[in-house]
Amino acid sequence: MTATLERRESASIWGRFCDWVTSTENRLYIGWFGVLMIPTLLTATSVFIIAFIAAPPVDIDGIREPVSGSLLYGNNIISGAIIPTSAAIGLHFYPIWEAASVDEWLYNGGPYELIVLHFLLGVACYMGREWELSYRLGMRPWIAVAYSAPVAAATAVFLIYPIGQGSFSDGMPLGISGTFNFMIVFQAEHNILMHPFHMLGVAGVFGGSLFSAMHGSLVTSSLIRETTENESANAGYKFGQEEETYNIVAAHGYFGRLIFQYASFNNSRSLHFFLAAWPVVGIWFTALGISTMAFNLNGFNFNQSVVDSQGRVINTWADIINRANLGMEVMHERNAHNFPLDLAAVEAPAVNG
């Protein structure tokens, strides 16, 4: 008896939609995470472009002193930004329908909240989509794990830090100069340069760049030549070939002699795990540092740690940084405060009378 097996056609529109969403044959994989990622990222991108070009000034400090951020209001690509939502709004959810008018929503910086919340949803779904595609193809899940580092960093500066500080106005502005302003004020208020988690992040980013350049140059310099001297060595490579494209033994030997034997990897898996893990772990730590400093667990304070036998302070570099921090702190939000928060935290002297 012969049984003929035919591919079962999905009877419903929903079934065909499910097949299309989860198909790995599409030019760009959609996936269930993509169903949420696409509209959220499109919304964030569209509103960002419109607001960067045409948004009116925003009362970021809640003191009726609007700050201009868009191109049509006098900025250029370097100085322009999406200004964070007003301190008058704080952490309140502020969609358009919560404002009395669109003009009020724009004046209070509503676009910033809209962009940031859609963006964070979108990049989280992008990470989930990476895992989903890996799962469909039978791959291991580490691509999504690596991408979790920049997702954690973005979540820290756009969501965790504003929550800790009590207002979206403390979030990072969406622009070049605004990012620098955020970094300077963050240093002034939290001494991030003296935080060990930030130091680990610097080692991760710079070390990752160094290791990436070293690896790429070693591989490119030790290609297995399949061509004549008159042709490029690149022409001998076929995409998907089973044979190795470079000689890891030669690269290992070169690097081992350049520095010392055990500074070089002779195992390709160990090498590539290290290349991935170093920057990812560093950025994880930085995101964790931002998230703790959000709640004012700040960098180390070594101010006035060294004194002479008479009790006079001998300045160290920590004191120089502290002086710079005070200068930056008194200059930012200059009309919102009459004195820096460091002085405001000191208890006022008792007055008798």
UniProtKB/Swiss-Prot annotation:
Modified residues annotated as Phosphothreonine in this record: 2
Stored CDD domains: Photosystem-II_D1
Catalysed reactions, as listed in the record: 2 a plastoquinone + 4 hnu + 2 H2O = 2 a plastoquinol + O2
Keyword set, alphabetical order: Acetylation, Calcium, Chlorophyll, Chloroplast, Chromophore, Electron transport, Herbicide resistance, Iron, Magnesium, Manganese, Membrane, Metal-binding, Oxidoreductase, Phosphoprotein, Photosynthesis, Photosystem II, Plastid, Thylakoid, Transmembrane, Transmembrane helix, Transport
Binding site for pheophytin a: 126
Positions of the pro-segment in this chain: 345-353
The protein's Enzyme Commission number: 1.10.3.9
Protein residues bound to chlorophyll a PD1: 198
Top-level EC class: oxidoreductase
GO molecular function: chlorophyll binding; electron transporter, transferring electrons within the cyclic electron transport pathway of photosynthesis activity; iron ion binding; oxidoreductase activity, acting on diphenols and related substances as donors, oxygen as acceptor; oxygen evolving activity
Marked site positions, Tyrosine radical intermediate: 161
Co-factor note (free text): The D1/D2 heterodimer binds P680, chlorophylls that are the primary electron donor of PSII, and subsequent electron acceptors. It shares a non-heme iron and each subunit binds pheophytin, quinone, additional chlorophylls, carotenoids and lipids. D1 provides most of the ligands for the Mn4-Ca-O5 cluster of the oxygen-evolving complex (OEC). There is also a Cl(-1) ion associated with D1 and D2, which is required for oxygen evolution. The PSII complex binds additional chlorophylls, carotenoids and specific lipids.
Annotated [CaMn4O5] cluster binding sites: 170, 189, 332-333, 342, 344
Membrane disposition: Multi-pass membrane protein
Residues the entry annotates as binding chlorophyll a ChlzD1: 118
Keyword Magnesium: yes
Origin: domain of life: Eukaryota
Disulfide bonds: none
Sequence positions bearing N-acetylthreonine: 2
Stated family: Belongs to the reaction center PufL/M/PsbA/D family.
PANTHER family xrefs: PHOTOSYSTEM II D2 PROTEIN (PTHR33149:SF12), PHOTOSYSTEM II PROTEIN D1 (PTHR33149)
Physiological role: Photosystem II (PSII) is a light-driven water:plastoquinone oxidoreductase that uses light energy to abstract electrons from H(2)O, generating O(2) and a proton gradient subsequently used for ATP formation. It consists of a core antenna complex that captures photons, and an electron transfer chain that converts photonic excitation into a charge separation. The D1/D2 (PsbA/PsbD) reaction center heterodimer binds P680, the primary electron donor of PSII as well as several subsequent electron acceptors.
Additional information: 2 of the reaction center chlorophylls (ChlD1 and ChlD2) are entirely coordinated by water.
Protein name: Photosystem II protein D1
Organism of provenance: Marchantia polymorpha (Common liverwort)
Lineage, uppermost ranks: Eukaryota, Viridiplantae, Streptophyta, Embryophyta, Marchantiophyta
